[in-house]
């Protein structure tokens, strides 16, 4: 049977009819010449409505914009990550670095180029450069640092192509790492951080520019290139390079630098910058290096997935129902939902209908006539060939504004395509089974059995079947197991024994972050706020442009345009780095221990992270994702290999020819994932989403046709649908359909209605306070040794061991020992009888 024309689309798949290309949108609000005058009645009613709808679709790009070919990964391509390190204002410094290297190189090697030397000669010269970093004169030290930076940049003056530069970069970087450059740079960086003279002069300056951070920028550039290059694995890597990579990762995550991991030093730079004590710090480079350090030491998202599977096996939990990374990669984007103006217009038209109820019934009859999920065998082959999973085109049947026309004649092959199944396996928590059994027992028996999930005596057969289905899909998370174990430790501290804490990189990093974690979170969010495109320039906001503004401000229009692009790009890179750091830390801490994650998440919430992210999305998100804030001819390594063409206003405006900006889409997805992490299973935080009116903001973000971004937007909408009221759900049926199709289902989750217990009034403050108490108990038990209960500490009663302990006495005490003996021992009477008794 052929499907009826206009068969409902959102809950089921849309007809694949060949559509003619849409006409271009009109340039003005006036109708184009020859346009049908619907008001004058020159077209029949149905045609006029169809024309209006097409016009509206075209003007909004409604479902016509193509899917964005974006693949989410830990980082962008290596070349893009290298180019984002440098601002365009730093362009002249490439030649300065080359000059410093060649002056020094010619003093020792006169007849050969760097690329013509053998490995031993390379190593000798690298060690000679390293020795030059130990001189006391700042100018000489800076020249040597620039020479090392030129080596790390791939000695581009002797290369003829970008690929050759990148090849020499890898070789030179591993060479520099081998001779111990990174540790020497860490010491120099520490010295620059504590350079009070530079800090005080920067504080007094009214305007800070690139020149104020020269030393720091050179050091951070070299360190970033080492971390980024060593972290990237290539097929042609030598065996010793792989060994060096593993050693470097271990060292970077170990407390070798001032008894703390290197990342803590960078976090310290961030807080010092935000406090106003060091406004000259090049924050973009610090944040990029911090992100790559965390990524290198803790591991990326695929590594995290394998660690999660491994940890589940250790805890005796069943394997994950699916690989979430693969599922998301195979998803297709849905069409953007209709805008509010469309919905209002449709409702007004419906209000004027005389036979509204009848029409709705007709639509529902047509909808029920043919169940699209009952796919017959004849359609299987076609479904296998068609992987377009998107919800396109048609509005939901209840949203229609006209009686359904008679079926049109379609070709035989043009069938209604149906999804094979939902992408995610449903999950059920133990708590959900308990609640279901409790309500069933109250209803059928009249009493409850608490947390007993096995006794089903007296319950009818259908309830037995329901419980069986729920238990089949039961999912126990690592976090639940960790929380139960923590309760056991607190309940029985003596019989529980000493907890064995595995010193993995995430644990070491958490221990380093713990004393000042609230300050670190506030500092990162302050910078994120300053870099957000929606934030207005305020006098009290921090200046994040210290490492992009030149000493002399531009004098021509072209220079101003170039600086404008540079500043926007600079802010985008900062947002990218902060969003990636926060997401990585949240995910790794959640895997390591749930209360480490909750501690960080709670401080993010207290620092207003939720409204900040919503404020970020309260902009034209399509414009942000398709922004062209880059000048490809000035990107490294292109700019050091090719002749620089003359820049024009047109070339600056054109930007690159990419469909979207990778870093901006990456940032948006990261921020949505952070928002999901903060609000998941937290009713108080979900209510913050409702209070801050996030639904229209998030709904606008659905216009971006990228499956992963849409998934996280739909997740955030799903958790608050029960609070948004019946009218919102009725007006947003297409969004509800997309949630049903793309977001994981909880079998007895009444998310689409307001009947759930969770939707009733809740003591939000008590919820956060209880969580905070659990976190504080965890931190005190595991990390706060000073406040341990003395009754549970081991006692040494052996006289020999006490007398054998070495006691370091202060020098002044040793000099006045005779005086102390006379005053404290000999002059005081001792009652020997009482002492011996």
UniProtKB/Swiss-Prot annotation:
Residues 18-35 have a biased composition (Pro residues). One of its GO terms (molecular function) is protein-macromolecule adaptor activity. The modification N-acetylmethionine is found at residue 1. Transmembrane segments: none annotated. It is found in: Cytoplasm. The modification Phosphoserine is found at residues 59, 335, 339, 788. The keyword RNA-binding does not apply. GO terms for cellular component: cytosol; FAR/SIN/STRIPAK complex. GO terms for biological process: cortical actin cytoskeleton organization; cytoskeleton organization; negative regulation of hippo signaling; regulation of cell morphogenesis. Its main location: cytoplasm. Keywords: Acetylation, Cytoplasm, Phosphoprotein. Residues 1-67, 336-423 are annotated as: Disordered. Pfam families: DUF3402, N1221. InterPro entries: Far11/STRP, Far11/STRP_C, Far11/STRP_N. Part of the core of STRIPAK complexes composed of PP2A catalytic and scaffolding subunits, the striatins (PP2A regulatory subunits), the striatin-associated proteins MOB4, STRIP1 and STRIP2, PDCD10 and members of the STE20 kinases, such as STK24 and STK26. The STRIPAK complex can be extended by adapter proteins such as SLMAP:SIKE1, CTTNBP2 or CTTNBP2NL. Interacts with CDC42BPB. Interacts with CTTNBP2NL. Belongs to the STRIP family. Plays a role in the regulation of cell morphology and cytoskeletal organization. Required in the cortical actin filament dynamics and cell shape. Part of the striatin-interacting phosphatase and kinase (STRIPAK) complexes. STRIPAK complexes have critical roles in protein (de)phosphorylation and are regulators of multiple signaling pathways including Hippo, MAPK, nuclear receptor and cytoskeleton remodeling. Different types of STRIPAK complexes are involved in a variety of biological processes such as cell growth, differentiation, apoptosis, metabolism and immune regulation. This is Striatin-interacting protein 1.
């Amino acid at each position: 049977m052929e499907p009826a024309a206009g068969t409902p689309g959102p809950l089921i798949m849309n007809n694949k009819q060949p559509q003619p290309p849409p006409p271009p949108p009109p340039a003005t609000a006036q109708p184009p010449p020859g346009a049908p005058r619907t008001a004058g009645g020159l077209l029949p009613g149905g045609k006029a409505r169809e024309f209006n709808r097409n016009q509206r679709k075209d003007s909004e790009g409604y479902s016509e914009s193509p899917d964005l070919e974006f693949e989410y990964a830990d980082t962008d391509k290596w070349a893009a990550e290298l180019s984002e390190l440098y601002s365009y204002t730093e362009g002249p410094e490439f030649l300065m670095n080359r000059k410093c290297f060649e002056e020094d190189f010619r003093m020792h090697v006169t007849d050969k180029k760097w690329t013509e030397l053998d490995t031993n000669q390379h190593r000798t010269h690298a060690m000679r450069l390293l020795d030059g970093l130990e001189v006391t004169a700042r100018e000489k030290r800076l020249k040597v640092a620039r020479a090392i930076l030129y080596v790390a940049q791939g000695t581009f003056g002797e290369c003829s192509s970008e690929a050759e530069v990148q090849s020499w970069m890898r070789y030179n970087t591993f060479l520099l790492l081998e001779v111990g450059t990174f540790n020497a740079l860490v010491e120099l960086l520490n010295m620059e951080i504590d350079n009070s003279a530079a800090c005080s002069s920067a504080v007094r300056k009214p305007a800070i520019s690139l020149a104020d951070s020269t030393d720091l920028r050179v050091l951070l550039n070299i360190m970033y290139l080492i971390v980024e290059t060593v972290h990237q694995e290539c097929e042609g890597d030598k065996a010793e390079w792989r060994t060096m990579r593993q050693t470097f990762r271990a060292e970077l995550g170990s407390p070798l630098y001032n008894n703390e991991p290197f990342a803590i030093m960078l976090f310290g730079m961030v807080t010092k910058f935000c406090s106003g004590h060091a406004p000259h710090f090049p924050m973009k480079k610090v944040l990029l290096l911090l992100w790559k350090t965390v990524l290198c030491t803790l591991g990326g998202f695929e590594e995290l997935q394998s660690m999660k599977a491994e940890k589940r096996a250790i805890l005796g939990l069943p394997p994950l129902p699916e690989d979430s990374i693969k599922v998301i990669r195979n998803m297709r984007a849905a069409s953007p939902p209709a805008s509010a103006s469309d919905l209002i217009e449709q409702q007004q038209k419906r209000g004027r209908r005389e036979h509204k109820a009848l029409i709705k019934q007709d639509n529902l009859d047509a909808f029920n006539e043919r169940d699209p999920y009952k796919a017959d065998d004849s359609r299987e082959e076609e479904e296998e060939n068609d992987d377009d999973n998107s919800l396109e085109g048609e509005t939901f049947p209840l949203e229609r504004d006209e009686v359904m026309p008679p079926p049109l004649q379609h070709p035989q092959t043009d069938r209604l395509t149906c999804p094979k199944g939902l992408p995610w396996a449903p999950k059920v928590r133990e708590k959900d089974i308990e609640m279901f059994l409790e309500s069933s027992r109250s209803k059928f028996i009249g009493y409850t059995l608490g947390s007993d999930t096995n006794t089903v005596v007296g319950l009818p057969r259908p309830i037995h079947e329901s419980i069986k289905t729920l238990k089949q899909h039961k999912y126990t998370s690592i976090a639940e197991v960790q929380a139960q174990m923590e309760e056991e430790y607190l309940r029985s501290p003596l019989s529980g024994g000493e907890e064995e804490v595995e010193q993995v990189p995430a644990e070491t990093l958490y221990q380093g972050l713990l004393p000042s974690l609230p300050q670190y979170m506030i500092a990162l969010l302050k910078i994120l706020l300053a870099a957000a495109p929606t934030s207005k320039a305020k006098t009290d906001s921090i200046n994040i442009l210290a490492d992009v503004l030149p000493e002399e401000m531009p004098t021509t229009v072209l220079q101003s345009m170039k600086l404008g692009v540079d500043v926007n790009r600079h802010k985008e890179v900062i947002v990218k780095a902060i969003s990636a750091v926060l997401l990585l830390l949240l995910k790794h801490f959640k895997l390591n221990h749930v209360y480490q994650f909750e501690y960080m998440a709670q401080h993010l919430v207290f620092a207003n992270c939720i409204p900040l992210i919503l404020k970020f999305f309260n902009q034209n998100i399509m414009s942000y994702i398709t922004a062209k804030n880059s000048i490809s001819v000035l990107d490294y390594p292109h700019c050091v290999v090719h002749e620089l063409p003359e820049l024009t206003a047109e070339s600056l405006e054109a930007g690159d020819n990419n469909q979207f900006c990778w870093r901006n889409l990456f940032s948006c997805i990261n921020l949505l994932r952070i928002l999901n992490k903060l609000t998941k299973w937290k009713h108080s935080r979900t209510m913050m989403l409702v209070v801050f009116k996030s639904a229209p903001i998030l709904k606008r973000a659905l216009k971006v046709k990228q499956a992963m971004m849409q998934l996280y937007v739909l997740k955030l909408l799903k958790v608050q649908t029960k609070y948004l009221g019946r009218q919102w759900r009725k007006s947003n049926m297409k969004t509800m359909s997309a949630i049903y199709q793309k977001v994981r289902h909880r079998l007895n989750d009444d998310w689409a209605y307001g009947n759930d217990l969770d939707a009733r009034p809740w003591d939000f403050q008590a919820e956060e306070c209880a969580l905070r108490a659990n976190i504080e108990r965890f931190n005190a038990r595991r990390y706060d040794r000073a406040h341990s209960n003395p009754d549970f500490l081991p006692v040494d009663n052996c006289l020999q061991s006490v007398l054998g302990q070495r006691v370091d006495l202060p020098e002044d005490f040793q000099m006045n020992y005779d005086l102390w003996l006379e005053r404290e021992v000999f002059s005081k009477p001792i009652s020997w009888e009482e002492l011996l008794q």
